[in-house]
């Protein structure tokens, strides 16, 4: 995995930013919102290796350590005096459902066999952060991503790495779904 380095305060690993000369930013704190990270923070971008989740699991120290770190994403809450950007909405700990960089994170529990946690958080987000009303989204509907997440999740699966053709199982809202494909077939 490129562009990772170990930041061993408490044994944690985070994705760290570099300045314009390629030097890692000093005094890095994963929960800071800085100009070095677009619309997010180190907690949220840490998981942005959808193409190599197994490599990230190994970097962190294996499945159990990965599960602990992933759990902490949802339980480590911003403090009251943190200056969160406008788009930090739909927060569950450091998970910001109101902004796209976090959307796939819930489904990463599946990659280490903790499917029940994926199912728990998918249901929590669908039931608590979406409303059937004009302003029913908890964040910015960039290119339809908020709605796409909900539609995929309501059907019970999600493309963590969209280019792989692989889908992760979640928590379907319906006992049966039938998709009518452009080629006339149904799925």
Give the predicted meaning of each segment.
Residues 12-173, 177-186:
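Active-site core of glycosidic bond-cleaving carbohydrate-active enzymes
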Residues 1-14:
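Single conserved hydrophobic/aromatic residue that forms the stacking wall/gate
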